[in-house]
């Protein structure tokens, strides 16, 4: 139901029968955490930063975050770990100077004395993070089922955003994830207050084009690339 968008878009470029039918997390929910001695993003010049991979979207995120402080690609070192948990462990072990982390690992790091230098959403709000992707062949045979799934998803987002449901949502997520309730509460508030979940079911062409452009920066997609090939006619709802 929920997946990062980079890999499916790469697959579509290689003619895989996939389509993006909804955005889920419409902006990147990462935070950049650093050792206690590092107080500002500008201090990361020449430092070692843990990212997801050499062609992972987190590389674009970090480059966007460092650019306003005058730090260009090549002026910091990178080490790669695909999982947020691994990047958090490297930071806490002192193996790296900074790491890009998802909730609740950013909260764990802050509690341990590490500094949050910034949120990715403040530097790249136009880049969507995750969405709903379907196999076109399956969708063609199961249209009514797909529509019910998408309808249920839209209702679940509305339910999540209703403050009356906070306690129940936290309890459900704590039970499912086996994460401490306190950490789930922080994560819930982060996602709810930041309006990270797309509430309308409409995919922004601007956001989709921005993600394609970012992937082209990484050399992942050809130029030109028609974003219309990413969507499913009659199912994907596109807006500006």
Question: What are these regions, as identified by a protein language model?
Answer:
Residues 1-74, 78-90, 97-103, 116-120, ...:
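Short, glycine-/small- and polar/acidic-enriched structural segments
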Residues 7, 85-176:
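Pocket-lining segment of extracytoplasmic ligand-binding domains
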Residues 10, 65, 108, 172-173, ...:
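Residues within well-ordered alpha helices
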Residues 14, 69, 112, 177, ...:
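Residues at alpha-helix termini
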Residues 20-21, 118, 169-170, 200, ...:
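Short, hydrophobic secondary-structure boundary micro-motifs
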Residues 46, 111, 232:
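Phosphate-coordinating loops and pocket residues in cytosolic domains that bind phosphorylated ligands
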Residues 140-221:
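Secondary-structure end/capping motifs
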Residues 209-240:
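Conserved C-terminal helix/tail region of periplasmic/extracytoplasmic solute-binding proteins
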